[in-house]
Amino acid sequence: MLEVAQKYLQLKSGEYYKCFGKVDKVVGLSIETIGPKAKLNDLCMIFLDKERRDYVMSEVVGFKDSHIILMPFDNVEGVGVGCIVENTGHPLTVAVGDELLGHTVDGIGRVTDCDEKDLELDSEYPIEAPPPDPMSREIISDVLPLGVKAVDGLITVGKGQRIGIFAGSGVGKSTLLGMFARNTKADINVIALIGERGREVREFIERDLGPEGMARSVVVVATSDKPALIRNKAAKTATSIAEYFRDKGEDVLLMMDSLTRFSMAQREIGLASGEPPVTRGYPPSVYSEMPKLLERAGRADKGSITGLYTVLVDGDDFNEPITDTARSILDGHIMLDRKLGHKNHYPAIDVLQSISRVMSAIATKEHKNLAGRLKNVLATYTEAEDLINIGAYKNGSNQDIDYAIQKIGAVNSFLCQGTDEKFSFEEELELLEKVFE
């Protein structure tokens, strides 16, 4: 009787038969198929045997003539010409819920450190989601303390702001993210580790993040050996998880390491689907996907997503395409300087080259005056540093330089901070004021 009812419902809905496709060609990262009927971003199953037991999940990334271009979420071992392809008819979603806190997931939201069935995940969020309407966004008006003196004092971040951390390799980006995750006043951390070395993931979770930070965090991991589609989706999965907590009224800190590797994954996808390479080999989709991702962060009527995105600067060239594009979209940038790291000045933040575009709107007048005075002292000393070091400057020649020499020790003391040091926002402002006593 049940079978009859199911057949009746199937006939009533017009689903008289199911369409399948077949693999026609496998080239590099992409799989070209003839059929089935599909839309962009639909999930498809590529079956590896006639019984249709084993399959590889893939996504529609483009169309070429009468062919569909798929990219797999796993390696393509076992996929060959003639394999049956079935369209699921829906795009990728991620299961979300409060019980995700304290856990790690992969690039498409599958829990990796326990059985997902043991967690009560009450909602499904689409991974590909549009940014909020500009007129529905709340204005950024509140400070979000991150617990690092140099940032809170001189590059103050607001709830809902998006800011980039720009640096070459090995300058301390991951360590700085760990400090933010442990010290921030945000309710929830969502951390995306994209294209990282496999050994660094556990090191970051146990050493940089620690039990204190992990307890209120969700970590999305897609290591460098994963397919380009997984690395690309990891950034969007992390943003979707952050959107879930924002919709619940939480203030979320979304940290992504790194935006550069997201763009590199998009480059692989774009080139494999037939896009032409343009600036430095990046296809046009890289420059359209980045703003789509970054614009999803921000304030809503109930909660906020504050985005911190690391950008790996290729060859320390701060004008290369990805760096330049990210800087133009974000609401500010924190520049890390390798030379400061060589002087054991950590975090190696170049505050003169860094800026928060919302600081003027959220900081008090007194705070802005103190930050301006410190930057003036640092700029004056930096300009005269070579003369001072070779002994060519004589005391009394310039009052501003004399004052900078007097205060530079206190300034550097304020800008440096140990990884285990923690300050409240009020304590940071007091320390900033003491620099000029």
Language model features by range: what are they?
Residues 19, 40, 100, 121-123, ...:
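A generic structural signal for well-ordered coil/turn residues at beta-strand boundaries
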Residues 25, 35, 48, 62, ...:
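Flexible glycine-/small-residue-rich
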Residues 1-103, 108-112:
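N-terminal accessory targeting/assembly segments
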Residues 153-154, 160-437:
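P-loop NTPase catalytic core
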Residues 11, 53-54, 92-96, 111-117, ...:
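Active-site phosphate-binding and catalytic loops of NTP-dependent enzymes
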Residues 83-85, 99, 112-161, 174-179, ...:
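P-loop NTPase nucleotide-binding/switch module
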Residues 88-92, 108, 123, 131, ...:
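Glycine-rich, flexible loop/turn motifs
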Residues 3-8, 88, 146-151, 238, ...:
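Phosphate-interacting basic helix/loop segments used at nucleotide- and nucleic-acid interfaces
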